[in-house]
């Protein structure tokens, strides 16, 4: 059995951690960084897949084939994300089931496929760091993620070749990381503002039990929205100054997105920042340059509505938990966007507490996931995690009413059954429509699945007894069953999004991902072979110059021929040919090594036979301490 890791699959950045000797450790990626950009790109010319920092670096020149913030589209229907789709540089299109697809060149990818590419890199980097295979993972999701979004995340893990042992909520993971070594009972509020989502969770910690009392949030609020406000401001300012609308230029917009994010980060530690983008566009008069100054006060004004939008979920979570601000012992900030000073001030205003800043908001969620992975693997003892379902779940009953079976903030796993009956005489089937939400009318909530129970014997309405059972597992994923108690006939479904991927699609994606992983390994091996051959050519050429005139002409010709053939092979694409020519050059260079060795021996012998002159021999020496030296200096 391989190693188990904890993964924070973020909107902007992702992070992976592992337990080593009982302590959680953040795993650096291949580039040496502790977080990896959640960005995937395909090179326009070669089609090569790039993930992480490499993908982010080329985003400006390749905006249509660079995918970022894919988490915003996970488990969502196309009609629900049209506004978000307009804000990204890549093409978002409807899929075959009304779901979301990303069109890159001539191929459409599902959001779980793109996320799987990020997970594959995290898995590979973890394996390189640990020196062993990674098979299992605990992956985090926003607490307010719906059932379909959780299922999509699990699908992404499966496509990446990971056995997803558990899906846990990000605020809960943060609390786990914070509270593992705390002995006293505490009530904590986790304020999690990431790149694309916002969550608030209230937990009680005591005796190794982490119990979530309430959770609330907004899946459409995050750092991306703050960046978008700055981008809108830049576009307007440039339009006023130059009369040019940059929003129509995809390459320029990608530069603006990066500049906006940079400005946002800088304004967390300084009161003003300069946004300088030379050659942003051009008109008939020549190139145009963008040079603007954004102050923190202006930024706060631009984003005031976003900061205010965090207040509602905080108050809702407190109300659901039956708490007043004074009942909260500690406030933990999670997510890079909590570094924004106005956000921190808002948290202080809402809770009356100075937020705890002793943990890295970019890493704490992955650390918590690694601890939970350790709990599931038996490496961490005496820790119990009790999470909750974020939204109420129920079915549509007569008159379009939403009848709740499981209330929001119910501890999971949980199971609930209720008896229903038919609405019409001689009704022989019932359609069970499953909804998620808080509205009284079913149609105002989100339909997450439906199925038919057939074969009910004809009877007057109200006579048949149909037992409907809702079962939520520890991942927050729902199973629904309906049973006719009269006949024993039963129908069950696991709720996946109506826009979800089928098992066949996932299996195909797993095979594609494995093929890509093999392709990546092969490319790495090919690069190593090329590098080794190139280094050999360089060192043999240099050595040949060093022994100029000391190698007979036939040996020189043989080596020069081998060098020439190796260079020709390196110019081509045949890796086997490169290997053959490298071996031939290695063999030819052995004679050169003999000459160099012989030359070194001769130099050594001539050096030792020369001996030493009397002037070089030290017969006696006087040792003088510092005080005597000072006296001598004074006497001079």
From Swiss-Prot:
Ranges annotated as spanning the membrane: none
Stretches for region Disordered: 596-636
Pfam families for this protein: HSP70
Any GO MF annotation of the entry: unfolded protein binding
Biased composition (Acidic residues): 613-636
Induction: By stress conditions e.g. heat shock.
Keyword annotations of the record: ATP-binding, Chaperone, Nucleotide-binding, Phosphoprotein, Stress response
Phosphothreonine carried by residues: 197
Tagged with keyword ATP-binding: yes
Biased composition regions of type Low complexity, renumbered to the chain: 596-607
Protein's UniProt keywords contain RNA-binding: no
Function: Acts as a chaperone.
PANTHER family attached to this UniProt entry: HEAT SHOCK PROTEIN 70KDA
Family: Belongs to the heat shock protein 70 family.
Protein name per Swiss-Prot or TrEMBL: Chaperone protein DnaK
